[in-house]
Amino acid sequence: MDTQGPVSQPFQQPEKPGRVRRRKTRRERNKALVGSRRPLAHHDPPVAIRDPPVVPTASKLVVITQGRLSREHRGLFNHEVKSLDVARLLSSGTLVPGSPTLPAKPSPSPGRAQEPAPRSRDKENQVPGGSGPGPPSSPELSGVGQLLAELQCQLSLPQAFPRRNLIQDARDAIVHTLQACHGCVPDLALVLRGCQPPLPGAKPGVSERKMTPFWINSPDQVPEQERQRKQQGTKEFTFPMPYTSSMPTAHRGSLAPPRGPWPPYFPSLSSPSGTAWGPPTAFDLLKSIWLVATPPPPRPWGVGLPQPLPQPSSPLLPRTSVLDWSPSPPSPLPSLSWVVAQSSPEAWSFPPMRLY
């Protein structure tokens, strides 16, 4: 037989079926917390400690502007100015900005404190300064209207507020300044003439000739004296550099480089008349060493080396050589595979790229 008896089970509280405990909301918890701290009895403070009741400012010093009643509103920063204490703003500074305009008078009952409100509502529909159909209600409003009229004459309000044509105002100011200084408005065509490029048929001025290189202008635009001086040349300088051009010996000594700061010439660029070029320079010698004399023939598909640019006309060239060559449109640049095939003994072939 079992002598230990039944096994003791822990104590379990029997649960009631069908009842779920609801958790309080935050509002209920806060209400219970604040309600516990609230004093049991609320005593009113004594009359001496109470603040004087706030009395609205008298409606006599408040002016309702026209911006609330009509479209001719000139407000500040596009905000509607509904009321303005003109007497306080135009005073000599006796009132402190933080102090109220009128001393606060305590009223025995709150009903009397609300009496000025309907009065101010009645005056909202009145035009300031007594300019309405009826006479002004008080002499202070007429005085405020007089102050507003004087202020408007001093400030010139139509020019100090928006809805203006700024471009027209700026143009009028410029025209008035020119008329006051010079007596008339100058012709804009004469002013803008210096900003426009010169006409192709006109001769450039002295300043334009100094700034513009000679190869930009055509031989017709070069002055006659400079053209003759450049064509004659000088024999003061000699160059011991060996000649590599195809000019005859008799013609080499007659031509010399010009005195002006002209860029070096390029005799390697083929020209029909080789007798028109001057003596070679060190740059020509380097080009004769490094550059190929004859370019390779073009391929059947029309890809070849870029053609050399035609040499611009200069004062040293005779008129016949200028008419010999004709400019042609630039040819397309050769492809990379063609350049590699020309410089390598073996033909380079690249397989087509596959996109994955």
UniProtKB/Swiss-Prot annotation:
<feature type="region of interest" description="Disordered">
    <location>
        <begin position="1"/>
        <end position="53"/>
    </location>
</feature>
<feature type="compositionally biased region" description="Polar residues">
    <location>
        <begin position="1"/>
        <end position="12"/>
    </location>
</feature>
<protein>
    <recommendedName>
        <fullName>Proline-rich protein 19</fullName>
    </recommendedName>
</protein>
<feature type="region of interest" description="Disordered">
    <location>
        <begin position="312"/>
        <end position="331"/>
    </location>
</feature>
<feature type="region of interest" description="Disordered">
    <location>
        <begin position="95"/>
        <end position="143"/>
    </location>
</feature>
<dbReference type="InterPro" id="IPR029355">
    <property type="entry name" value="Pro-rich_19"/>
</dbReference>
<comment type="function">
    <text>Promotes meiotic crossing over formation through its interaction with CNTD1 by participating in the crossover differentiation step of crossover-specific recombination intermediates.</text>
</comment>
<feature type="compositionally biased region" description="Basic residues">
    <location>
        <begin position="19"/>
        <end position="29"/>
    </location>
</feature>
<keyword id="KW-0469">Meiosis</keyword>
<feature type="region of interest" description="Disordered">
    <location>
        <begin position="216"/>
        <end position="255"/>
    </location>
</feature>
<dbReference type="GO" id="GO:0051321">
    <property type="term" value="P:meiotic cell cycle"/>
</dbReference>
<keyword id="KW-0158">Chromosome</keyword>
<keyword id="KW-0539">Nucleus</keyword>
<dbReference type="GO" id="GO:0005694">
    <property type="term" value="C:chromosome"/>
</dbReference>
<dbReference type="Pfam" id="PF15455">
    <property type="entry name" value="Pro-rich_19"/>
</dbReference>
<comment type="subunit">
    <text>Interacts with CNTD1.</text>
</comment>
<dbReference type="GO" id="GO:0005634">
    <property type="term" value="C:nucleus"/>
</dbReference>
